[in-house]
Amino acid sequence: LQSLTRRYCTEINMIIGPSTDIPAPDIGTDAQTMAWFMDTYSQLKGYTIPGVVTGKPIAVGGSLGRAEATGKGVAFCVNFAAEKIGMKMDKNVTVAIHGFGKVGIPAALDLAADGVTVVAISDVSGGVYNKNGIDLDKAVKWVEGRRFLKDMPGVTPISNEELLALDIDILIPAAIDGVVTKDNCDNVKAKIIAEGANGPLTKHAIEALSKKGVF
């Protein structure tokens, strides 16, 4: 992975930079990946340039809270949306998170701290559901052990498509793009959708859900 990262940086170094285009970590990458990227770019330019990437380790100029920032931002936006539509954020509010990872985990933890009930989460293997709420601490430890959610005990396995169609209040697609489309948007029952991934709703889905009054 290090060799691949450094070669990739070498090949694109002329089109990135602090004042042009700044790479950031995403699926399959982490702070170490970004450190390799920054180091390679700096070697090519002849001096240290921390600003070429975000998501670096703190030791080489990274920012405190960067890893959780997107997920916390999603939770903040959910609270704002709930206030706008008059939804009281308490245990009766149910949440499903499609993508229990770098964005989904901090979003889930923050929203649970706000008092809502996270009833479903998912990863690439599928989803899990518990109408009384997922044990998030247990779930975090489970995925940190590099295990699939579908194998976690004490919950009901569901598919990712079933998660999207749950009768819930808040849906957070926080995995990949193109998750909610013209083919499945009619199945979505959530009152609020907070996009934690890049483009998880297609244009058709956004238009159709807006007409239904989804915030």
How would you describe each model-predicted region?
Residues 96, 170-172, 194:
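Structural motif
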